[in-house]
Design a protein with these regions (language model features):
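Alpha-helical, hydrophobic structural elements that either
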Residues: 22-337
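Bacterial Sec-dependent N-terminal signal peptides
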Residues: 1-25
Length: 337
């Protein structure tokens, strides 16, 4: 089951009334970066449309559900390799790494390419691996320092492997840069983590516990409504980028026949102010929304923080396995460019 890290941009897709002429930059800023202060009278109409579309989506569910027998070992697959062997895989990855500058979609990118040893691909697939750029110290042909576009790195990559071949052997990891360069000289440090275990909390909607600890995080369930699982992480920063980076949660819905529902599984952050309004009024109109959240309140939404959301196509109505992945093996690699 794949989780798309922080699809807050989905808010835009929820709205049926936003046409292609609208400037997407404000949507990216408000919903993908948590920059509510950029809302103003000129763009507020599109923002209200997006919020209203999101609320409509929360009230709609897919009636056709595909089921599959729940196999815990299959879902929570673990590596058969020892931690020492996994460390040697990272060492091999470091040794085989190559960095290059490429231009794609009119944007210059720093590209890391490498591969794991053959014994790794027999025991794991690359979804087990998270890669994050930690530091970048390089200059271009004019001796000007090259700067990574940190927003792109955090929001789009965030440890996600963007490309892998059919043998799950070669990896490719990309970061945008905002300094025009024909060549680069220097070093890049990446952190590489490998999945080793899962922290699992079994929940029952008919007798729901609302607070629990998982993977060193304190979770408070705000609500499980229809197809969305809304929760707060109490012992972490409420700042958007940090919450986005730490989003490491999934949920499985298991019926009384021990079957799990299949479908899309999205994860993202939502402004607390928005969800609290929806929780009180499922059928809120646009006019009511505008009265409760005038532009000046929209602008201040990020001050009150964000909830975490897991969204499925179908309603949560059975036993729920809420889980977090544990990356027990971690090591930095330094690559020359």
């Amino acid at each position: 089951m794949k989780k798309r890290l922080l699809l807050v941009l989905t808010f835009i897709l929820f709205s049926k009334e936003i046409n292609a002429q609208q400037n997407p930059n404000i949507m990216l800023s408000v919903f993908y970066k948590g920059e509510s202060e950029k809302i103003n009278n000129e763009n507020s109409s599109a923002i209200y449309d997006a919020i209203y579309g999101m609320f409509e989506n929360y009230n709609a569910i897919s009636k056709e559900v595909s089921l599959k027998k729940f196999d815990e070992k299959e879902v929570f697959f673990k590596s058969t390799l020892s931690n020492e062997k996994l460390i040697s895989c990272i060492d091999s990855l470091s040794k085989n790494s190559k960095l290059s500058l490429v231009t794609q979609f009119n944007k210059q990118q720093l590209v890391l390419e490498s591969n794991f040893p053959s014994f790794f691909q027999k025991n794991n697939d690359l979804n087990f691996v998270k890669i994050k750029l930690k530091s970048f110290d390089a200059i271009n042909e004019n001796k000007k320092k090259i700067v990574i576009d940190s927003i792109h790195t955090t929001s789009e990559n965030g440890g996600t492997l963007l490309d892998k071949d059919l043998t799950y052997h070669t990896i490719k990891f990309q970061d945008n840069i905002n300094t025009s360069s024909k060549k680069a000289t220097g070093f890049v440090t990446y952190n590489v983590k490998i999945l080793t275990d899962y922290a699992i909390q079994k929940l029952n909607k008919s007798n729901l516990i609302t607070t629990f600890s998982i993977n060193k995080k304190e979770i408070k369930i705000v609500e499980i409504y229809n197809k969305i699982f809304v929760f707060d992480v109490l012992n972490e920063s409420n700042e958007f980028n940090k919450k986005a980076e730490n989003f490491n949660y999934w949920a499985l819905d298991i019926d009384n026949k021990n079957e799990r529902k299949l479908g899309s599984n999205m994860s993202y952050l939502i402004y607390k102010d928005l969800y609290n309004i929806f929780k009180l009024n499922r059928k809120i109109t646009k006019e009511e929304l505008k009265k409760l959240l005038p532009v000046e309140k929209l602008q201040k939404m990020k001050e009150n923080g964000f909830y975490n959301v897991i969204e499925h196509d179908f309603a949560f109505d059975n036993t729920i396995f809420f889980y977090s992945k544990i990356y027990g093996v971690s090591k930095d690699i330094k690559v020359k460019i």
